[in-house]
């Protein structure tokens, strides 16, 4: 019998079903607890090897978790071990709604998908998609700002509103009017996820703390994160990279870059006013790690439920 054949016979048992042991699932659980992806996969492979050498063909999910926990402790990963147990208690017993906000080009999509992969959250929704749905429901005559980009929405304001604002104020007023109808769709998705007990990550420019309903700020399993980029050079490079893999014109972003900067600063200020973490997204790996730490800390008070999860 080959090594691979032996591994395929290891079953992880639960009350309702059995499933084959998976290094990928275990590595993802360890990664969510804060271990580096390369280290988490190495440890998962070692645990797989130990089970094989001990001729373990069936193991309960609880016993596997104990093995993983004590392996972490013995390797001086005590902090990760505690977080690992925390996530095992929380996942699948509480829906997780993570809102990743930030202006155009700061990297909300990339971070959202990385978090989804680490946490095993199957659904990532961009607010641009929600905006498209809202456009089908609201006519252009009623809310013309909705039919513009976040940084050109000011051009759809009435002339009388132009006269009441300075240039920056006009840009931000247009942005707010653009965001408001999209927030209705975002809040509807959050409400449905909470009702159905499903987890989701929503990302995009339209997530602005202080403009959303106050009730979401106090919910322990609705977590706001704001990304920013202080470096203009890095920010512009992100637009250049985006233009290479999509049909979004680089020139349009660069022409409106000063307005995008104003919107970025506005979102940062609103985040600080509402005690939402602001994360400098220069390094993807460091940003993901920081986000995981914030999410883990937020869930540290939700540990009274019995452990049950599709993760190991």
From Swiss-Prot:
Query: Which cofactors are reported in the record for this sequence?
Result: a divalent metal cation
Enzyme category, top tier: transferase
The pathway it acts in is: Thermoadapter biosynthesis; cyclic 2,3-diphosphoglycerate biosynthesis; cyclic 2,3-diphosphoglycerate from 2-phospho-D-glycerate: step 1/2
Q: Where is the ATP-cone domain?
A: 8-95
Which InterPro entries does the protein's record reference?
2PKG, ATP-cone_dom, P-loop_NTPase
* Residue runs in coiled coils: none
Protein known as: 2-phosphoglycerate kinase
Entry function: Catalyzes the phosphorylation of 2-phosphoglycerate to 2,3-diphosphoglycerate. Involved in the biosynthesis of cyclic 2,3-bisphosphoglycerate, a thermoprotectant.
Q: EC number(s)? A: 2.7.2.16
């Amino acid at each position: 019998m080959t090594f691979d054949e032996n591994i395929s016979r290891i079953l992880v048992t639960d009350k309702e079903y059995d499933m084959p042991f998976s290094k990928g699932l275990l590595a993802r659980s360890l990664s969510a607890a804060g271990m580096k992806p390369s280290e988490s996969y190495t440890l998962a492979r070692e645990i797989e090897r130990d089970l094989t050498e001990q001729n373990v063909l069936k193991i309960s999910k609880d016993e596997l978790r104990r093995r993983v926990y004590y392996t972490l402790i013995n390797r001086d990963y005590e902090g990760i071990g505690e977080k690992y147990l925390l996530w095992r208690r929380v996942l699948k017993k509480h829906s997780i709604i993570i809102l990743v906000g930030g202006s155009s080009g700061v990297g909300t999509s990339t971070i959202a998908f990385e978090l989804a992969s680490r946490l095993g959250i199957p659904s990532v929704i961009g607010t641009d998609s929600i905006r498209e749905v809202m456009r089908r429901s609201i006519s252009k005559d009623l809310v013309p700002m909705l039919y513009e980009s976040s940084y050109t929405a000011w051009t759809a304001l009435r002339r009388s509103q132009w006269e009441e604002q300075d240039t920056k104020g006009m840009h931000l007023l247009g942005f707010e009017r653009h965001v408001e109808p999209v927030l209705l769709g975002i809040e509807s998705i959050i409400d449905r996820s909470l009702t159905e007990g499903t987890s989701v990550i929503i990302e995009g420019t339209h997530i602005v703390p202080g403009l959303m309903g106050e009730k979401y700020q106090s919910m322990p399993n609705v977590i706001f994160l704001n990304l920013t980029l202080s470096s203009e050079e890095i920010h512009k490079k992100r637009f250049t990279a985006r233009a290479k893999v999509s049909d979004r014109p680089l020139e349009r972003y660069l022409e409106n870059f000063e307005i995008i900067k104003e919107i970025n600063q506005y979102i940062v200020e609103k985040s600080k006013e509402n005690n939402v973490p602001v994360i400098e997204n220069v390094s993807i790996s460091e940003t993901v790690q920081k986000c995981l730490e914030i999410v883990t800390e937020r869930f540290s008070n939700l540990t009274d439920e019995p452990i049950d999860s599709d993760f190991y």
